[in-house]
Amino acid sequence: MRLTGNDPVSSLLPAVFDWIRADSERPVLGTCAGAILLAEPGDGGDPLVDTKIERNGFGTQADSFQSNIEAEALGRDFPGVFIRAPRFTSSGDKAQVTAKLDNEVVGVMTNNRMALSFHPELSGDSGFHEWLLRTAEKLEADSK
């Protein structure tokens, strides 16, 4: 992640961050390492979500696990897959909790930028990806 995106000869992450920052309502879904990038872009700019995060906060690869989480953004439980997952250590006033594991925050959102410490793409449940598509479709329809 850091080797390609922040390499002086690569323009990948700066272009992505510019695209995200260009529209605060643009829906973005960052999972695991993507959540880290949203919280700590590392490009000298402000965080893209109003939260602090600890890399590998849930432990090593051997500590990886699966557990049902309360997905407040979806209004239902969701099968969370945690692989060397980051841990949210604090959230600011602009952050909305989108998911919890027991009482611990595992998902936050600022505007339409959602950061998740787990891997929804490995769960077999498309709920968070459907949220992303619905939000993008609604913004597109509202702009016409």
Listing of model-derived features with the role each one plays in the protein:
Residues 1-30, 35-41:
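Flexible gly/pro-rich beta->alpha loop and the following alpha-helix that scaffold active-site loops
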Residues 31-33, 49, 84, 118:
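A secondary-structure boundary/capping signal
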Residues 29, 81, 114-116:
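Hydrophobic/aromatic beta-strand patches that form the interior of the parallel beta-sheet core
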Residues 42-104:
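Pocket-forming structural segment of enzyme catalytic cores
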Residues 38-40, 65, 125:
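Generic hydrophobic alpha-helical membrane-span motif
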Residues 77, 87-144:
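C-terminal and late-domain segments of enzyme folds
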